[in-house]
Amino acid sequence: MKDWVKTVPKAVLHDHLDGGLRVETLIELANEQGYQNLPSNNHDDLKKWIQPKPDKSLAINLEAWDHTIGVMQDQDSIYRVTMEALEDLSNDGVVYAELRFAPLVHTFKGLSTVEIINSVVNGIKDGMQKFDIVAGVILCAMRQEQNSLDVVNLCIEHKDVVGFDLAGPEVGFSVLNHKEACKIGRAHV
């Protein structure tokens, strides 16, 4: 049955770019960049650690993203992760995907939002050529931050962006805090 499922054309409308790195890529990028915070450099141990745990809270499960985001702070890494995401999706029979990510969490080492978004967009364009898949990018604002208007404006400025989203922990961070951004996003994106 598993082989049959791979052959059926699929659409993936909710794929977090910075939440689905290959374990080997996470380890390689950490080693290349001198990132010392991984809980393990052993492939199997790290794979087990980053797997979502249904018995744990969303906040606990999001801890893995501290590490994936930690190694996605330069254009080459962001581009590579984007290309690999499209390759993996294509190999699973996905013909259309919407990759979402929060650009502002990739600015910690000085990249501009334009550089970050362009790295993803270029990865998508090249990945669509190489892997026979159609994809778009959705920009996320983080619920716990107060910059959702900035993110929705980035969506409007970049013609390659197909949507706006709120991501992050829901408890304690109401969507009502982002009402204006959602209203603008709905009207323009």
Question: How would you label these PLM feature ranges?
Answer:
Residues 1-186:
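Metal-cofactor-binding active-site regions of metalloenzymes
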